Amino acid sequence: VPEGETAQSYIRRLCEEGFAEKYRGEKPEYHNQLDYELDMIEKMGFTDYFLIVSDFVRFAREAGIPVGPGRGSAAGSMVSYCLGITDIDPMQYGLYFERFLNPERVSMPDIDMDFGDTRRDEVIDYVRRKYGDDHVANIVTFGTMAARAAIRDVGRVMNMPYADVDVVAKQVPSGPGALHITLDDALRLSKPLRDMYDADPQIKKLIDTAKSLEGMPRHASTHAAGVVITRDPVVTYVPLAKNDETLVCQYVMTTLEELGLLKMDFLGLRNLTVLDDAVKMVRRQKPDFRLEDIPEDDQDVFDMLTAGKTSGVFQMESAGMTGVCVGLKPQSIEDLTAIVALYRPGPMDSIPRFIACKHDPKLVTYKHPALEPILSITYGCIVYQEQVIEIFRRLAGYSLGQADMVRRAMSKKKRSQIERERQFFLYGDPERQIAGCVANGIPEETAKAIYEEIDAFAEYAFNKAHAVCYAVVAYQTAWFKYHYPREYMAALLTSVLDNSDKISEYIGECRDMGIALLPPDTNRSRDGFTVESEGIRFGLVAVKNIGRGFIQNLIRERESGGPFTGFQDFCQRMYDYDMNKRASENLIRAGAFDSLGAKRSQLVAVNDK
C-alpha cells in the first residue's frame, strides 16, 4: 500500500482506474456492482487478500509471464476484473460475486491463478522476495494407500510370495471408471476377488488387513500449486520442514484453511505457454499483434471445431469432446462454455437433449415463463450453478447469498436442508424476507415441479465462471490454429517434447493440415520447433541425448562464429562443449547435417572413428 493511503483507499483507486479502462462511458449498473463488492470485501476483511493477488498478477504481466483469463468462481467478481486479476467480464456472462464470496457464509476467498507452466516459479519467487522467505511456504500433501497398493504393502509385511500377492492385487478393478475404488467396492464388483477372499483364509486376512489401511497416508510430498503467505514468519503458526531447501508447512491445505491462513494456488498451464510462444512468433512479422485483440465471434474458427478439427485445441481435443463439437456445432464462446460444463460424468447424459434443443427451438420448453430469461442461453437446460442461484432469486425472492447456500446444500446432498428449503421456495420465509414462488404468482404445482428439477440437476451443475475462463482459452487456441497454423503447431509441438505420443499425434495433424515438417538442422534449428517459410523446423531438443545446455552453447557458437561449414568444422568448434559421440551420432541420424551435403552413412562412419 503506497504511503498516505489505506488498503481500502488503495483498492478503490485501483478498481476505479481499472473500471475506467475496461468500461468506456457511463455504466451505472456496473459501477453499483463494483461498489457493492468493495463494501462486501471490506466488511469481510479481505481487502489485503485482493491487493496481494493483484500485486503478483501485475508483476507477472509486466514480466511477460503468461497469465490465464481466470480460474474458478473468482471470475465472477467485478473487483477481480477491474484489478486485472481476471480477464472475464462478469456482467457480460451473467456471473455472480456471491458464488465466489458469500456474505451468508463467511469463509476465506479462494483465488487460484493459472500461469504459463515454464514460468510459474518466477511468480512464486517474486512473492518470496516481496514478503520474505520465512513468510512464504509450500504445503505438504500426503499420498494415500489405494486398494491395490494396500494389498501389496500388507502382503510384503506378511511375507507372502510377491507373485501370489500380485494375483490378488490385479483382481481389483482399474481404469478410469474405477478411480478411488475401495476394497469393499472391489469385493462387490470382482467375482474372482470375492472367490479368493471366501476360499483362502490367508487371502481373507490379507484383504481385511489392507481394508483397515487403505486411505491412510503412505508418503509425504509437496503440493503442486499451494502456497501460504503469512504476516509473521510461517513458523509462528505451523510446524515446518525443508524439502530441497524449500520451506513446507506440515499441515495439509484443509487444516491451514481452518486456521485462517492465507492459502493461494499458483498453477502452471501448458496451453498458456503455447499461446505465448505462438504470439511471439507472430510478432516477428506483426510487431503490434496482441492476443487480447482477436475477435470473439470468428465463424471460421467455429466451423473448424464443427468439422471436428480439434486436435491441439485446449479442452476440446479428446474424442468425446470432438464428438460434442461436431454434434452441437458451436457458434459462440457461450456454446463452448456449455461444452466445458457438460462434458463430465452426470451432465453428459443431458448432452443429447441439449444438442437437440439447440438445433430445434420447438423442443425447448419452460415450466414457467419466468425461467426463459434464465435458461434460454442453454436451450432450456439447467447447466450452471449460477442458473440455480438465479432461479431461486427471481422466482422465490431469495437473496443471491441465500440462494447459493441452498445450491451448496443440494450439491452436497444435505437432504434435511433440501426438504426444509422446499417449503421456503414454495411458500416463503418471512424471517429471511423470502416471498416464495406462490406469493410471486407461480402456481403451486408448477413451483413443486421446478424445485424437483433443480434438486435433480443442482448436484451436477457446473460453476459457469470457471467454464467461461476455460472456454475463452479453448477459443484462443482454436483461433490461432486456424489463422496461424504453423506458429501454433510449432508452439504446440515444443510444449510436448517430453511426450512421444503427443509429438506423433501433432506431427500427424501437421501433415493433415498440409504443413511441411523440416528435419533438425545444426545451422537453422533452435531448441524448440520454429517456423520457416517452407514449414515447421524440428527443434534440437527433439533429438535424443542432446541436452538443453549443449543446445544453447551450439546456438551461441553459431551466432558468434557463423554457420557450421561441415561436420569437421562442427566437431572442432563444439569440442570444448562436452560433445560426445552418442550426441553427434544422433544428430547425424536425425538429419541435422543433411544441409551440409554429406551422406548420413558417411558421417556415421567418420563419427565412429
Language-model-derived ranges and their functions:
Residues V1-K609:
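Noncatalytic, beta-rich nucleic-acid-contacting surfaces in large DNA/RNA-processing enzymes
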